[in-house]
Amino acid sequence: DEQHRFGVGQRLKLAQKGINPHVLVMSATPIPRTLALIIYGDLDISVIDELPLGRQPIKTYIINPAKRHRAFGFIKKHLDLGEQCYIVCPLVEQGDEDLGLEDVRQYAKRLCSEDFAGYSVAVLHGKMKPSEKEKTMRTFAEGKTQLLVATTVIEVGVDVPNASVMLIENAERFGLSQLHQLRGRIGRGSCESTCILVTESELDRLSVIKSTSDGFKIAEEDLKLRGPGDFFGSRQHGLPKLKIANMLNDINLLKLAQNAAASLLYEDPALTMESHDLLKSAVQKLFERADI
């Protein structure tokens, strides 16, 4: 589960637990490499594209930082209705002031004394002790905290149906799949939910998040921007070592190659026929390069 959270080496070790095991991978936000493997025919795909009963689509907006206080007013309106909200920041601590980003703890402290004075606010980040993180998250899940200011530590394993609004600061610093994963922390109940991306740059790139909730379409855009990485190596992004082919523009050719490979392996699964010696040697060299 949450396949995108595992590195290439980790997934390979899991697959080696048995002898040629069947492997089922699940993710709402496939990484570019996964989408590339689907295109290459290494993975079969099943898509569950229906919302669970009672849930509504999440509305997503992109705003300029100048409109942040209007967004805060929108959040307070929902807090006053008894709902809960997230504000997500890219930084855990100070040290990146040159990037114009604010430490999540200082940011939360400022919110408590200014815009959200009188509201119950908590902070959550990855450098907290496990017991502290668990306590903070449990308090939020129980409805005792109204607003949770957090880093991407909330990206996975958080299910609070009463949380209906998420504001993401410096949205341009997150990957598309990561933004989609974060957005999935809201809209888990019956309330209409809203995700607000605060940024003053990369509007074209982020517009795909606004326009779709389809994880595969978002992964496809990520694939165009980041590249799929190595298919047989450990890099999960970057351009593959293809001299002529383009995996996005040559999908029809890839499908022909998939069908030809399937027919060949049906006829000669172990590539033992003399006519396949050269192909077998090339495949072995490819696997040796990747240490498979």
Language model feature labels by segment:
Residues 1-207, 217, 267-272:
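Inter-lobe coupling/hinge segments of SF2-like helicase ATPases
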Residues 190, 202-292:
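C-terminal accessory region of SF2 helicases/translocases
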